[in-house]
Amino acid sequence: MTPKDKQLANSIYLILAALFIASLVTSNLIFQKFFYWEPFGWYRFEISVGILPYPITFLITDILSEIYGKKKANQVVIAGIFASFFSILIILAADFTTAINNSPVNNETFHQVFGLSPFAVFASMIAYLFAQFIDIRIFHFWKQLTKGKHLWLR
């Protein structure tokens, strides 16, 4: 691989990592809004909008696994978890501060939107971490089983 190709590969990796982290953190910020989904009019599901970015994260880890390998994909997952916890700490710190009288967002509104249940978020992040690691492991299991062929199967 030429130095130019290496630089391009690194740039693509960083872009994919940034998209992964942005999707993960965004899902944690928007999870409190819900909508109804009625596939084919058969059943009505009440779903958090926080689920919308999730498929993007799994697609990105599959792309990273295919191109950069299991180790690099796992590194992005761990970086995403750290970014999520860090953003939660910032939000909690912001929630503990007192808004000034003429603030466009008062304390109650801010807390209602961003006042996270730390235990629920922690449990969600741990479940997500395991789901991502399992996804990456299964992806590589199928890749090894098919000897790198049948990408559609993975």
Q: Where are the model-predicted features located?
A:
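N-terminal membrane topogenic signal
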Residues: 3-18
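Internal alpha-helical transmembrane segments of multi-pass membrane proteins
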Residues: 146-154
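Central hydrophobic cores of alpha-helical transmembrane segments in multi-pass inner-membrane proteins
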Residues: 52-63
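Hydrophobic alpha-helical transmembrane segments of multi-pass membrane proteins
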Residues: 48-52, 122-129
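Cytoplasmic-side transmembrane-helix entry/capping segments in multi-pass membrane proteins
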Residues: 13, 17, 72-82
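Membrane-interface interhelical connector segments
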Residues: 94-119
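Alpha-helical transmembrane segments of multi-pass membrane proteins
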Residues: 21-36
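Transmembrane alpha-helix/helix-exit interface in multi-pass inner-membrane proteins
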Residues: 84-103, 124, 128, 132
